[in-house]
Amino acid sequence: MEAGQIFLYLIIALIGFYIIRKVLVYRSVKHYSPVNASLKLKKERNVVLLDVRTDMERKQDSIKGSYHIPLMDISSSENELKKFKDAEIICYCRTGNRSMNAASKLKKMGFNAANLSRGIIGWKAAGLR
């Protein structure tokens, strides 16, 4: 086998590993549509909405009643998050990608976390405030 072929197989294996990892992370997190998340927030007391976007994004727009901890600060904010230990934390960002990573991190930290599918863009598109 030539070095070029070995390199190609290695790249294919790495891409496969990356895709499998993303699928496993996605499947390990519960996802709520904007409408279902809104209904859950209205009906249940032990549900919290967490904005994981940057400070600048938060200043532009946010979902009323949500808390804010940027994704890059999640791991170092465990003490701040302890007040939500018994709640379900629904994370959101702009499109739902960063919030999925945040929910995965929170689950690893022992929290009951979920993702808002399609993020604040989906929330606004559904006519929610």
Positions of the model-derived regions?
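Rhodanese-like catalytic fold shared by cysteine-dependent sulfurtransferases
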Residues: M1-N36, K40-K43, V47, D55-E88, ...
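Short, surface-exposed ligand- or partner-binding patches at beta-edge/loop junctions that are enriched
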Residues: Y92
